[in-house]
Every structure is written in C-alpha cells, then in structure tokens.
From Swiss-Prot:
Organismal lineage: Eukaryota, Amoebozoa, Evosea, Eumycetozoa, Dictyostelia
Amino acids binding nicotinate: 68, 256, 356
Role of this protein: Catalyzes the first step in the biosynthesis of NAD from nicotinic acid, the ATP-dependent synthesis of beta-nicotinate D-ribonucleotide from nicotinate and 5-phospho-D-ribose 1-phosphate. Helps prevent cellular oxidative stress via its role in NAD biosynthesis.
Cofactor binding: number and manner: Activity is highest with Mn(2+).
Name of protein: Nicotinate phosphoribosyltransferase
Amino acid sequence: MSQSNTPLKRKKTENGYSENGSTTGATSNQIRELKRATTVDYVYRDQESKDKIKPLNGFVTPLLTDLYQITMAYSLWKNNRHEIPAVFDLYFRKSPFGGEFTVFAGLEEVIRFVSDFHYTKEEVGFIKEMIPDCEQEFLDYLSKLDSSSVTLYAMKEGSVVFPRVPLLRVEGPMILCQLFETTLLCLVNFASLVATNAARHRLAVGKEKVMLEFGLRRAQGPDGAMSASRYSYLGGADGTSNVLAHCFFGIPIRGTHAHSFITNYSGPDELLDASIKDTNGNVHNLLEMSQKYRDELGYTATNLSELVAFVAYARTFPNGLVALVDTYDTLASGVPNFICVALALHQLGYKAVGIRLDSGDLSYLSKASRKLFKQIGEQFKIDYFEKFSIVASNDLNEPTIIALNRQGHEIDVFAIGTNLVTCQAQPALGCVYKLVEINGSPRIKLSQEANKITLPGRKTAYRLFGSEGHPLVDLLVDDNDMIKDGSKQIPQVGKKVLCLHPFEEQKRVIVTPVQIEKLHHIVFEKGQLTMPLPALNDIREYCFQQISKVREDHLRNSNPTPYKVSVTKELFDTLHNLWLDSVPIKEMK
C-alpha cells in the first residue's frame, strides 16, 4: 500500500537533528552505517515498506509475536470471523514500584509498527513452516494484509496515567487487532516501566540536581540498553553514557573515566609527556605544577600514580576534568590530588569540573569534599572551587537517594545505572490487552478477582481538574452514551458529574470540574498518521508538565494517596448488567 510521506516527516538537518537541537532520529543512511554487520536491517524489510515509517528496531516485525496469535488468526479466518469489527483496550491494573502513577511511553514505536504492518514473502514462508497444514488461501490473505483498516486511539506519550484507563484503543478487523496484541504489549510494557522508574528517581533526586543514566553495561542486552536510555531520558534523566543512544536519539552524552585509567599508571615515568599549553599558547609542565601545589599544601602522602593519572586526563580535557577519586582513598588521596591538578589548571587559565564518588559513605564524603573545596577556594581566592561538581554513582537507587536527602549531602549529579535501566525494584509493568467490543456488542472478561474484570465497550477517558489545577479523577465514558440524550453527554466544565468506582457502588463522588482534558485521540487511521510524531525532547517536556500537575500525595514514595479512576452511571450499569448476564447461575440440590 502506497501512502504520502508528507504528514509523517520531521524536520531534519544533515546531521539528523531538528533545528531546535532535539533529535529526530537517524536518517536511513546513518542507520545503515551504524548497524554494521547484522542479519536484521534496521531500515527496510522489503521494497514495499520503503515509503512507510518503520520501527527503529529491526526485530519489530509481525513475527515478533506469540505463536498462538498466528494460530488464532488462522482459526478466525477459517471460521469467517476474521473481518468482524473489534475493539481492544491496552491498559494496566496496578502502577509499578508500589506507587500510584505511571508514565506512558512507547507510543511512537507502536505507531511505527502499526504503520509498517505487513508480511513479507519470507515471513509468510516462515508461517507456512510453523503451520504446515494451513491452507494456501490463508497465506495469500496474510501476504495482502496491512493496517489500512485499523484506527488507533491513544493517550499522549509522556502522559501520567493510572490503572484501568486504556493507554491504547485499537479498532479494526478482529484478525488484525488480535495479531497486534503481543507486539503492542512488548513495545509499551518496558518503555512505560523504564520511563516511570526514571520519573520516580527524578522526583527523589529533585529538580535542582542533575540525573544521568549510566546503565549500558548492566542493561538486558543491546535492545534493552537502547530502550532504557531512550525512555530513561523521556522520564527524567538529563543525559546518558550510551554513545549509540546519543547518535540515534540525540540524548545529551556524559561521562567521566574508569578506575582502570587510574591504575594503568604506576608513577611519573609512565607519563611520557606532561606538557600543556596555557590559554595564551605558552607551554608548561602540568605534572610539575601539580606537584608544586601538592608540596605547598602538604599533600605529600597522596598516591603519586593517581596524581599522574589525573594530570594525563587533564592534559587531554583541561576544561572537562571530572576525576574519579576513590581508587585508593577518597579523602586522603583522591580529592587532594584533584585539588592540586585543579589549581594548576586554574593557573593556566582552565577550569576543572569536579569529582566522582563511586564508593563509601556518599553523604559524609560529599560534605567533606565540599568543605575542602571551599577551604582551598578561600585560601587561593578562587570563587568557583567551592562550586565544583560532585558526582555520585555507587549502585544508586530510589531508596538510597531518599536516604541521602534525609542525611544531607553535597551531591550535584546522580549517575544511576543498574537500578534505573533494569528496573530492579519491579521487573515488569503488567499491561494487558483485552477485547471489549465485537461487532458493536460490548464484551467482558470475568474473574474471581475484581481488578481483573474488564470494563466493556468503547470508552473515552476524561481527566477532571479541581480548582487548584490538580487532576481529581479520570472518568471513563461509554462512547455509545455520548451520542444519546442530553443526560448522557460527556462531562462539562462547571457542571456536576457523578463518578462511580467501577466495582464498588458505594464509592462515589460528585465532581464539579473547572477544567476537563480529553485523554484519548486518534493517532492512526486509514493507513495514515493523524498528527506528526513529536520529538523526544518534546515528549520529555510534556512528561515533566504532566507530573507537575499531579498532587504531591499521589507522587510520594511512601504510602501515596490512591488516584480515582471512575466510570459514569451508564457505564457502571452496562458493566454490571453484562457481568450478571455472563455468570452462569449455579444450581443446588
């Protein structure tokens, strides 16, 4: 199926960045160059997909699914149920990490997947191998299948979302909606989990501090690493150490150096060239200058090979020295050696940046380091010394950061790795994808657990805001009711709205909203995007705006206040009538 590229393009410059400096993603040629030798083409699976937007990850194809999706599709086709119009909701039942909010992420990749959905000749061949007895007519049908008959509704990527509110609503032929299930869940679950984890860490770190994602080496493989860097940035990280994520997504890149850079020096003789030009172009010996300050300050007991390593790095980056100071002893060697080199750089017209703490009592060490910086700054009358950046890394996580805040610290930058990218506190979000309407009739899935019962029918969510500007409740409205008489219209500003708990009728509240936000919008229809894909920086900014509107008690780390997700009286009645009609009546004798 051919389609115009016009509404799908973003502004690009030659280096793949938009004019405002945010990333637009790599160009086709850049991706081809970056992918190196691989059996997966990150750009085109075949010539037919050339005019479409495509998933950024070459593994995201219709075959990235569970086998039973294909076997169900075959059965739907064989029983002539494949073209029946269906509606599916993708949502989650409980927010992660013991919290009350989630950040929705992964929508762009969902749209890319849906837009590019089709089976290549080779993929149809794989299906034939997996189901040898399937009829050729079914394979022919699959080879012509595309997403032109699908309509996709979604909340905005970066939205703060709550349990039971659909993140996506997929409408289309039953066979297509069913074939989407596993892939959509895969694309949304991890993305939203990481973005939420990053947002929670950002709340713990605070607005005034810098938060970096340093998790590449601990991530769950290359694909997990790239997704984690992307969605950590969306949720709150200010930068990443992941070079490829910087190249693909334009995420600000940050880094220091490793302990191996320090320990690879054993003495001054191994620094073959200690020369450095000052800002006027005059040549000096940086090691001799640093040793002079070492003698002057009485730091002669520090590890000399560490000083040599700092000098070597400073020669390379005279305005970018962030020294890792815990290789031997943070306060007895690392910090004093850094000060000596920083003083020498200052004399030459340069400014060191700061230090990184990677072990020990981060609260105590950061405060002791700051005190020493202040003393030296006053002694040499250098104002910026007391403002040196102190970076902390040491297996940080949300509880550790909160504890540091309680203890007090002088940390400026939190470099978070393992616990951010792997979501160690909770490994999965648990989104589900449920059929809620078939051929115009609402459907329900029952369970002994009330929270696993689906909310039937096509629904649109509205966020109702109170007088203080905070959201009070997300209200789910049955779309069929919105076209009926006036008593069943959508909520309106200034008018009282009855909001009911979906399963407990006694839990109800009347809300008079001062502002109403419709949460679901068509993002894909008739084979076309209905709006441009926003840049990652724009999604990130939207996420920050969303979080700033939520009441603090909903966001807090410990015992957050539950957020209300309600239904209208009409949807409540539909739900419970369908519930009663669907449950068999038991007989007793």
